[in-house]
Amino acid sequence: MPVAEFYVDDTKKGEGTHYKYDAGAIDGYFKSYAARLESWRAFAVEEGLDSNRTMFEETIQDVPKQHWPLCVLDHFFSASSLADKRVVIFGTMEPWAEALCLGLGAKDVTTVEYNDLTFEHGALTTIKPDAFRRRVEDGERWSIALSFSSFDHDGLGRYGDPLVPDGDLQAMKLMRKALEPQGIAFLTLPLGQDLVVWNLHRRYGPLRLPLMLQDWQVLGTFPWDETRSVEDGNFRQTYEPVFVLMPRDADQEEEEDREIDEGRVCSDFSSGSDDQRRKAK
């Protein structure tokens, strides 16, 4: 695995950080994302994006990167909303994704983060990874999981997390275990040629991306760009599409392993494909 260096200390020299948002600040985030959702929803309805996935995939190519999570979440939940859904978010230091989920109707949102967080809102809970892991071991489950630009940092120590070379793979397994059997995860990672940038982040390509996705069925990748997904460019100018994932069950894994052994599959990272796992074989 190629290695580059760009060292960042987000621990305040080991003292740790505490990000606090009072009710007024969170209400501001909520109103901002509610307005963005309303604007995007009106556009999506006018353009018929809900009923035409191909058109949605083409349209999101022209949407600024920072809005991709909003567009994809709305696309999947505009009809059913997140009403009565429990959401877990892995890695955040400000409640933008939480506000987005509340805007989509989430019942409650749990945020898992190494830094100290205080979100003063009745529907928001913050928790450290070890405590969250214990809740999962005790059988607690969530309907929806989000990890936006988070797991690529896990195990590199930038945010005070333990140094674990496979911290990102472990995080994916924890997210899978935390989901209900038919739960859905939304994931973004920097894509390109495989690279570990110590201690900034990882970039995922043909070597490590299949390992990250090996326990998942890929329902879609938005927006998908085959060329950008394997570029070996500036590691600070990242391409991070939104992967929409569902945990694989044992029967499905057994059938797909049989297909692989029989040579009945091909490798393809295209949107909606789950062949990323097959490349790992």
Predicted regions and their residues:
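Class I SAM-dependent methyltransferase core
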Residues: 88-92
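Conserved beta-strand signature within the Rossmann-like core of class I S-adenosyl-L-methionine
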Residues: 182-190
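N-terminal accessory regions of S-adenosyl-L-methionine
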Residues: 1-86, 103, 198-207, 211-212, ...
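Class I SAM-dependent methyltransferase SAM/SAH-binding core
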Residues: 93-135
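A short acidic, Gly/Pro-enriched loop at the edge of an enzyme's catalytic core
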Residues: 135-146
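Conserved S-adenosyl-L-methionine
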Residues: 217-228
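A short glycine-rich, Lys/Arg-flanked "PGG" loop and its adjoining helix->strand segment in the class I
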Residues: 163-181
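A conserved beta-strand element that flanks and buttresses the S-adenosyl-L-methionine
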Residues: 146, 151, 155
